[in-house]
Curated annotation (Swiss-Prot):
The gene is fni. Its main location: cytoplasm. GO terms for molecular function: FMN binding; isopentenyl-diphosphate delta-isomerase activity; magnesium ion binding; NADPH binding; oxidoreductase activity. This is Isopentenyl-diphosphate delta-isomerase. It holds the Pfam family FMN_dh. It comes from Chlorobium limicola (strain DSM 245 / NBRC 103803 / 6330). Disulfide bonds: none annotated. The keyword Flavoprotein applies. Gene3D superfamilies: Aldolase class I. Belongs to the IPP isomerase type 2 family. Its cofactor is FMN; NADPH; Mg(2+). GO terms for cellular component: cytoplasm. It is an enzyme of class 5 (isomerase).
Length: 360
């Protein structure tokens, strides 16, 4: 990889974090869908609040709570500090940590420390490597896979599907041919479970079944409702080229808000366990998770754990990451108590009701 291309990637990574922290890049025409559902109150919970246990299991590992610090950053100098903060918080709470795209670890050996630092500060929790679908489509060598996994002693490998982001990205790679074939090969050869995630446009039930057929063990739905990476890349495009993107004004707003709401994604993907041969995969709910209440709703819809990137990035930047996570876990404890459930694993769809369902 040439120095110029590597430098472009470094600058892009830096821009992503800066834009997410300082610009309005959320969905403004749709929500994650959690506002459409609420829990049925249990006036007789018959439990003691102090008996509530948030611990659960994920990919066969016990974790302290059903929350993951989701994939966000790495591959540039200042990412080391952010990833250290993420790692320290993950270790403190005993929760999984996803790493940002590790393409830079393959392109530029000088940027490896920004990824490797997470295992130094999170030695005992599940940590997940991450690479993009375009890189998978081109075929990852055994050496590439070894670098990704060994650098952080990864417990799983995330493959992120980001077609909309690549479409808007000034230097984006929009060749998504052969992703599924190469994903199947990856699942058959990699020594750790493979997780497939979107980055904010969601994964439908139909798409989920295709990647499960390929051998994927976990689906992170990453639905619409949180960060719109189309907006992030649109800002970069305008800054670089000093003009609007190549789409018509009539279509642009819809494309910037393109995606399936997170709650719908969870419900669709979860239903596959009832209607297909795939019964043992796990679901991560991300995309617009803003509280422990959203996590609770995700679990009741069928997710195993919830995850957040954007909200926790802001918290880490403001040095209040552990405080934010603790608040979210308190939210979750409150929901468990008020539904009469003593653990996250016991939340079910029957605890939910559509807000606008007719009374009679």
């Amino acid at each position: 990889m040439s120095d110029s291309l590597s430098n472009i990637t470094i600058e892009r990574k830096h821009n992503h974090v800066e834009i997410c922290l300082h610009e309005a890049v959320g969905f403004d025409r749709k929500s994650a869908g959690f506002d459409e559902i609420e829990f049925i109150h249990n006036a007789l919970p018959e439990i003691r609040f102090s008996d509530i246990d948030l611990s659960t299991t994920f990919l066969g590992r016990k974790i302290g709570a059903p929350l993951m610090i989701s994939s966000m950053t790495g591959g540039f100098e200042k990412a080391s500090l952010l990833n250290r903060r993420f790692a320290e918080a993950a270790e403190h709470f005993g929760i999984p940590l996803g790493i940002g795209s590790m393409r830079q670890a393959l392109e530029n050996s000088t940027q490896k420390e920004s990824f490797a630092i997470v295992r130094k500060y999170a030695p005992s929790v599940p940590v997940f490597a991450n690479i993009g679908a375009p890189e998978v489509a081109r075929g990852l060598s055994a050496s590439d896979i070894g670098i990704l996994l060994e650098l952080i002693e990864a417990d799983a490998l995330i493959v992120h599907l980001n077609a909309a982001q690549e479409l808007f990205q000034p230097e984006g790679n929009t060749d998504f041919r052969h992703v599924l074939d190469q994903l199947s090969h990856l699942c058959a050869t990699v020594p750790v479970p493979v997780i497939v995630k979107e980055v904010g446009c969601g994964i439908s039930g139909v798409c989920a079944q295709r990647v499960l057929d390929a051998g994927v063990k976990v689906i992170d739905v990453a639905g619409a409702g949180g960060i719109s990476w189309q907006k992030v890349e649109e800002i970069r495009y305008v800054r670089q080229r000093e003009r609007e993107n190549r789409f018509s004004p009539e279509a642009l707003d819809d494309l910037l808000n393109w995606g399936i709401p997170t709650a719908r994604c969870i419900a669709e993907v979860s239903d596959l366990k009832k209607h297909t041969v795939h019964t043992d995969f796990e679901i991560i709910a991300s995309g617009g998770i803003r509280s422990g209440l959203d996590i609770a709703k995700s679990l009741a819809l069928g997710a195993r754990i919830g995850a957040s990137a954007g909200q926790l990035l802001n918290a880490a930047h403001e040095e209040r990451l552990e405080e934010t996570i603790e608040t979210w876990l308190n939210d979750l404890r409150a929901v468990l108590f008020l539904t009469g459930t003593t653990s996250p694993d016991k939340l079910q769809k029957q605890h939910l009701i559509l807000k606008h369902r007719p009374i009679l």
